[in-house]
């Protein structure tokens, strides 16, 4: 989210986000920023859900580990998380919704056809 630039108040300069925002303005798509965030975020949530449920369905699987649920803007940029770089919710999914597929007990339904 290039609108988070103002939150960078320490030593890290968000030059990557500055460049992306400038490019979006030049290409006249900045006004669609929230639509892009919502669409890519919804896809990220679906992919996390699919990966976690696939792991849970795997016989004798010992568990799963996620690298990170937050965006990363370090040496490169990876805005792929369901949390922003400050570990705050992007509003893509609630805690309770996430627990439905990544909680202590997750019921899974197996069928040949639905």
Language-model region placement:
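Substrate-binding clefts and catalytic carboxylate motifs of secreted carbohydrate-active enzymes
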Residues: 1-114
């Amino acid at each position: 989210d290039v609108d988070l630039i103002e939150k960078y108040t320490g030593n890290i300069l968000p030059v990557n986000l500055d460049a992306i925002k400038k490019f979006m303005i030049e290409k006249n798509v900045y006004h669609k920023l929230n639509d892009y965030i919502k669409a890519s975020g919804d896809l990220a949530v679906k992919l996390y859900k699919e990966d976690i449920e696939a792991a849970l369905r795997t016989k004798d699987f010992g568990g799963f580990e996620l690298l990170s649920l937050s965006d990363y803007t370090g040496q490169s940029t990876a805005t792929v998380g369901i949390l922003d770089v400050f570990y705050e919710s992007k509003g893509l999914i609630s805690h309770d919704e996430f627990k439905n597929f990544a909680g202590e007990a997750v019921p899974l339904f197996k069928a040949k056809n639905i």
